[in-house]
């Protein structure tokens, strides 16, 4: 008999249900989490033993959205879900980041978390539900896990924080922030903001962490009721004697190596020391394990670097804690791109381009929550040569997708509205060198490239990565961290914004005990660094260029009567197709009659506008037009008078005298002046050559050209 255990609680404006024991009973743990009709089924499976020779923690998080959850069929030829989309990849990272640091040091058993969206309410995003589900499943599994965590989304509407805002509320919000943490520590923050202050951002983090405590309490209660016993796992014993011996042989040498400021030279020296120590120790005792020695050397390396920072000594590259590396900023570095910039900060460098396109270049995204169009794309590429390595090149990896989204968040708040700038914009950041904070270099480069392209952004933005080294009550916040400081530190804290406020905040914390005071110090220090970088950027370009690139399409907008849209499009799109081929332009028509003509050549755009005006012009009775004979029949001739309009010249209206045979007076393709006699209710046009000739003889209206 299936007997599920259910726990229900109120979480802000939503009701959350945790249910276990009903499905996937062969998994280590499984939980169905529902929040107002959005349901995510989360399973956890953990291997009882680590693989032989395993030297890292193999945690995998898979997040998958099923089309049936929204009552839809998947797109594509096969009509089934395929590889994860960008949104699914980002949500998988969102789940992974706060749970990864909560597994104990030395735990190397394989763990897989699978979150499947099985029902979706369009107003309730599944990401928070999936994070709660992962926390609950891990807490029930018995796998060594120092959780549970809670998760919350925080909005900022009418100067008030809003817990887990609906999708409609998010459209009015100046903030979209996700925070996750344990009962006493914040572990992860991901956000985008509309130029909020540092205090407002910190307040949102604290608010979200306080509100999610009810989630943690209910997961703990569920685990106490039906959770499996915690595995009898013990951390591998530390060989203290070997630790001492390694320290004797390597500590001083590693300290000297970390005085080498150039990254590649330092890495080479550190590798040389490690290889030497391992070889010497194995020569002394071949029963020793090279992997264990390598792990001890890694821990010693970390202690050496952290100790220097905590003692107030200069950092790896000789800087003080709040110093920014040397900056080099250049714009317009590529001749044919619409906008470009080369941003260099120390040994981190980004070549960033901006490309302008029309509305048809926008990305149409078919998501579980519905379809949407994205007019601003930012892509981040991290090739292996940027760190002096060889490697596979191909489609973007999870990290590249995540870094690209963070950089996009940093710039999004300053992008102009569609009405102010009707272009689709694509920014690409090519990381050509990397030694820490390449995503924030991408924010700086994107701002510069957009201004170089003439995109009227509201303000320049810059990004900075902060780090933290903390031992007990002693802590040091580092500005503009190197890759090593990121790897060996306790916090990665990235902030992007303008002079007026924050546009994006991302935080990943590896330890507990990060207080509000520490976060406040980091945010304030980041603001100073950001303003310094903006000052240097403004020396290169201090405002968007007054005009877009000569190689970019110029968009000209005109308005036509919505009833005339069908005339411009034509049967099966024939007219608009012919227009684009004839004029060499791109033409887009909206339902309200707005027509956008994009062309790199101004004369071509003017030609297209003139043709559209002709097509949509009303035929005036009594007006003379220059037309072309298109068809000859027994009772007269049909004459095209422009804009795809055609009228009949009856045989009696060809000449002043009686006409026996139409072809005696008119030939196919002949150009003639015609006067409009009548437009009937059905839109049929009656023309007269006879009347046009009479008017011309009397010196009346000159004929209007019809193309």
Swiss-Prot record:
GO biological process: mRNA catabolic process; RNA processing
Keywords linked to the UniProt accession: Cytoplasm, Magnesium, Metal-binding, Nucleotidyltransferase, RNA-binding, Transferase
KH domain span: 553-612
Residues annotated to bind Mg(2+): 486, 492
Identification of the protein by name: Polyribonucleotide nucleotidyltransferase
Complex formation: Component of the RNA degradosome, which is a multiprotein complex involved in RNA processing and mRNA degradation.
Single GO MF annotation: magnesium ion binding
Entry cofactors: Mg(2+)
Keyword Magnesium: yes
Enzyme class of the recorded protein, top EC level: transferase
Reactions catalysed: RNA(n+1) + phosphate = RNA(n) + a ribonucleoside 5'-diphosphate
Gene source species: Edwardsiella ictaluri (strain 93-146)
Statement: the UniProt record of this protein carries the keyword rRNA-binding: no
Family: Belongs to the polyribonucleotide nucleotidyltransferase family.
One annotated Gene Ontology cellular component of this protein: cytosol
Subcellular location: Cytoplasm
Domain S1 motif: 622-690
Chain's role: Involved in mRNA degradation. Catalyzes the phosphorolysis of single-stranded polyribonucleotides processively in the 3'- to 5'-direction.
PANTHER family xref list: POLYRIBONUCLEOTIDE NUCLEOTIDYLTRANSFERASE (PTHR11252), POLYRIBONUCLEOTIDE NUCLEOTIDYLTRANSFERASE 1, MITOCHONDRIAL (PTHR11252:SF0)
Pfam families named among the record's database cross-references: KH_1, PNPase, RNase_PH, RNase_PH_C, S1
Lineage: Bacteria, Pseudomonadati, Pseudomonadota, Gammaproteobacteria, Enterobacterales
Record EC number: 2.7.7.8
Domain of life: Bacteria
Gene name, Swiss-Prot/TrEMBL: pnp
């Amino acid at each position: 008999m299936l007997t599920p255990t259910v726990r229900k609680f109120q979480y802000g404006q939503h009701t959350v249900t945790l249910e276990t024991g009903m499905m996937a009973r062969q998994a280590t743990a499984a939980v169905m989490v529902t929040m107002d009709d959005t349901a995510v089924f989360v399973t956890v499976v953990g291997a009882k033993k680590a693989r032989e020779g395993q030297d890292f923690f193999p945690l995998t998080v898979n997040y998958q959205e099923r089309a049936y959850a929204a009552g839809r069929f998947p797109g594509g030829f096969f009509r089934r879900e395929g590889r994860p989309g960008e949104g699914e990849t980002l949500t998988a990272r969102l789940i992974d980041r706060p749970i990864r640091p909560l597994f104990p040091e030395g735990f190397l058993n394989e763990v897989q978390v699978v979150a499947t969206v099985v029902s979706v309410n369009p107003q309730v995003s599944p990401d928070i539900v999936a994070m709660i589900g992962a926390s609950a499943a891990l807490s029930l599994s018995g796998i060594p896990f120092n959780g549970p965590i809670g998760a919350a989304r925080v909005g900022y509407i009418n100067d008030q924080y809003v817990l887990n805002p609906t999708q409609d509320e998010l459209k009015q919000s100046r903030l979209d922030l996700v925070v996750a943490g344990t009962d006493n520590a914040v572990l992860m923050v991901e956000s985008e903001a509309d130029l909020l202050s540092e205090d407002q951002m910190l307040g949102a983090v604290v608010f979200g962490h306080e509100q999610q405590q009810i989630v943690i309490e209910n997961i703990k209660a569920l685990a106490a009721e039906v959770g499996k016993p915690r595995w009898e796992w013990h951390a591998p014993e530390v060989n203290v004697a070997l630790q001492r011996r390694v320290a004797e042989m390597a500590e001083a040498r590693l300290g000297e190596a970390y005085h080498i400021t150039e990254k590649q030279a330092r890495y080479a020296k550190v590798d040389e020391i490690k290889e030497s120590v391992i070889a010497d120790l194995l020569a002394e005792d071949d029963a020793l394990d090279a992997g264990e020695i390598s792990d001890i050397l890694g821990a010693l390396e970390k202690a050496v670097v952290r100790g220097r920072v905590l003692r107030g000594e200069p950092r790896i590259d000789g800087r003080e804690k709040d110093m920014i590396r040397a900056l080099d900023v250049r714009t317009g570095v590529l001749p044919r791109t619409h906008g470009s910039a080369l941003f260099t900060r120390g040994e981190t460098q980004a070549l960033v381009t901006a490309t302008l396109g029309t509305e048809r270049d926008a990305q149409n995204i078919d998501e579980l929550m519905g379809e949407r169009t994205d007019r601003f794309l930012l892509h981040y590429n991290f090739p292996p040569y940027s760190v002096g390595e060889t490697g596979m090149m191909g489609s973007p990896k999870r990290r590249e997708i995540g870094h690209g989204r963070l950089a996009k968040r940093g710039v999004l708040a300053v992008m102009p509205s569609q009405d102010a700038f009707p272009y689709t914009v694509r920014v690409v950041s090519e990381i050509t060198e990397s030694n820490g904070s390449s995503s924030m270099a991408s924010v700086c480069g994107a701002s510069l490239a957009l201004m170089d392209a003439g995109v009227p952004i509201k303000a320049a933005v810059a990004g900075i990565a902060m780090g933290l080294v903390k031992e007990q009550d002693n802590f040091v916040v580092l500005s503009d961290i190197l890759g090593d400081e990121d790897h060996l530190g306790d916090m990665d804290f990235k902030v992007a914004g303008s002079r007026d406020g924050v546009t994006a905040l991302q935080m990943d914390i590896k330890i507990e005990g990060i207080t509000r005071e520490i976060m406040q110090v980091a945010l304030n220090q980041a603001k100073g660094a950001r303003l310094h970088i903006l000052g240097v950027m403004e020396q290169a370009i201090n405002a968007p260029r007054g005009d877009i690139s000569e190689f970019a399409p110029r968009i000209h907008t005109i308005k036509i009567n919505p009833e005339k849209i069908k005339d411009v499009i034509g049967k099966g799109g024939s007219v608009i197709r012919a227009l684009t081929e004839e004029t060499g332009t791109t033409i887009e028509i909206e339902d309200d009659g707005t027509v956008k003509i994009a062309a790199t050549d101004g004369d071509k755009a003017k030609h297209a506008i003139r043709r559209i005006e002709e097509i949509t012009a009303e035929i005036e009775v009594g007006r003379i037009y220059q037309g072309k004979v298109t068809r000859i029949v027994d009772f007269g001739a049909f004459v095209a008078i422009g804009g795809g309009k055609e009228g009949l010249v009856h045989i009696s209206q060809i000449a002043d005298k009686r006409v026996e045979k139409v072809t005696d007076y008119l030939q196919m393709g002949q150009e003639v002046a015609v006067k409009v006699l009548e437009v009937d209710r059905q839109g049929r046009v009656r023309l007269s050559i006879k009347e046009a000739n009479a008017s011309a003889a009397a010196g009346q209206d000159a004929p209007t050209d019809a193309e």
